[in-house]
């Protein structure tokens, strides 16, 4: 009887000697690994049950240190907004925010309580994110891997930099940056779209949504395909890439019969990687052009025959009466 996955959890957990990872004599990577490895049944339901050891390089220490500094600054500013009341902090957490400076300060350093804390927190967050990006590159170098994970994370960092650094500088004011808060940053997104004539008419926003939904579709198609042929060894994808077996043949046949085309066992990962990477890249381009090049995306879309031109009234007054507008005039 072939093993078969019947739910999203791993049903059989195999445990042996903890895997310590590779070590090159010249790198002394083992010296920087911390924590005694152990196994977690809960973690094993979702992936590999082994926890640790963790590789603590200098980039990890800097990233964690500055990230915690950002978290503490934002948290204490939110706590101060509710009079240092823990119950109110918990109650209003979703609505609290550390806001960027007001427009009158431009790109200067404002007083702490007028946006200065926001600038300081943003500095620590920038250092944390960029150091973590460097960590991804250095770890790939040490393991002699490709840089695909680094470039994938770099695409997300591009959007992060556009929102909090590049665009505010081009606009000449830190007030253009995104506030730190759960609902407030969503409110900022809505107001940003309304302010510039609806981002739906931004072609790069359109592309970003295409790649976002496309990534979800590809992930679902690939994940479903592999689970469907796991009983034939389809989960051993590396083997199937260089030595195609019955799992690959069955999966390829299924998709050829479904839509007339099938990706390869290697190619589907390139499709998924590019779709995922292009989501923040195109989104970042669209955000960077907003306000700097295009003031109103709806008018821009009309001028480029992307949106309809509305001439005159198009409310119920144009129909003579409200009843005629809703089609109930006698």
Curated annotation (Swiss-Prot):
Membrane topology type: Multi-pass membrane protein
Entry superkingdom: Bacteria
Keywords, in A-Z order: Bacteriochlorophyll, Chlorophyll, Chromophore, Electron transport, Iron, Magnesium, Membrane, Metal-binding, Photosynthesis, Reaction center, Transmembrane, Transmembrane helix, Transport
Protein localization: Cellular chromatophore membrane
Official protein name in the record: Reaction center protein M chain
Signal peptide start and end residues: none
Lineage, broadest ranks: Bacteria, Pseudomonadati, Pseudomonadota, Alphaproteobacteria, Rhodobacterales
GO cellular component, one term: plasma membrane light-harvesting complex
GO BP of this protein: photosynthetic electron transport in photosystem II
Family of this protein: Belongs to the reaction center PufL/M/PsbA/D family.
InterPro entries attached to this UniProt entry: Photo_II_D1/D2_sf, Photo_RC_L/M, Photo_RC_L/M_CS, Photo_RC_M
Residues bound to Fe cation: 222, 237, 269
Binding positions (a ubiquinone): 255
NCBIfam families (UniProt xref): pufM
Subunit structure: Reaction center is composed of four bacteriochlorophylls, two bacteriopheophytins, two ubiquinones, one iron, and two highly hydrophobic polypeptide chains (designated L and M).
Pfam (any one): Photo_RC
Primary location recorded for the protein, binned into one broad class: membrane
An example Gene Ontology molecular-function term: electron transporter, transferring electrons within the cyclic electron transport pathway of photosynthesis activity
Its biological purpose: The reaction center is a membrane-bound complex that mediates the initial photochemical event in the electron transfer process of photosynthesis.
Transmembrane feature ranges: 57-83, 115-144, 147-172, 202-230, 264-290
Annotated residues for binding of (7R,8Z)-bacteriochlorophyll b: 185, 205
């Amino acid at each position: 009887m072939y093993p078969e996955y019947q739910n999203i959890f791993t049903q059989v957990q195999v445990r042996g000697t903890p895997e310590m990872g590779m070590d090159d004599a010249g790198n002394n990577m083992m010296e920087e690994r911390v924590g005694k490895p152990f196994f977690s049944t809960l973690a094993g339901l979702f992936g590999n049950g082994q926890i640790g050891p963790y590789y603590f390089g200098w980039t990890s220490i800097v990233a964690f240190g500055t990230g915690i500094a950002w978290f503490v600054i934002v948290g204490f500013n939110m706590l101060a907004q509710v009079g240092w009341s823990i119950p109110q902090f918990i109650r209003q957490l979703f609505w609290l925010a550390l806001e960027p400076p007001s427009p009158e300060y431009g790109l200067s350093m404002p007083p702490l309580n007028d946006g200065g804390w926001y600038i300081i927190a943003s500095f620590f967050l920038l250092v944390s994110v960029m150091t973590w990006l460097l960590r991804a590159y250095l770890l790939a170098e040490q393991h002699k891997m490709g840089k695909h994970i680094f470039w994938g994370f770099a695409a997300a960092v591009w959007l992060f930099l556009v929102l909090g650094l590049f665009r505010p500088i081009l606009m000449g004011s830190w007030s253009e940056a995104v506030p730190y808060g759960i609902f407030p940053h969503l409110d900022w997104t809505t107001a940003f779209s309304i302010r510039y004539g609806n981002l739906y008419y931004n072609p790069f926003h359109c592309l970003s949504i295409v790649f976002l939904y496309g990534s979800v579709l590809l992930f679902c198609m690939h994940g479903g395909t592999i689970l469907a042929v796991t009983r034939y060894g389809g989960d051993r994808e590396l083997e199937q890439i260089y030595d195609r077996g019955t799992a690959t043949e069955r999966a390829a046949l299924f998709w050829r019969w479904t839509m007339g085309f099938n990706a390869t066992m290697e190619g589907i990962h390139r499709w998924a990687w590019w779709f995922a990477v292009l989501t923040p890249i195109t989104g970042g381009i669209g955000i960077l052009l907003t306000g700097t090049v295009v003031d109103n995306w709806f008018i821009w879309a009309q001028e480029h025959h992307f949106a309809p031109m509305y001439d005159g009234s198009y409310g119920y007054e144009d129909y003579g009466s409200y009843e005629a507008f809703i089609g109930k005039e006698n």
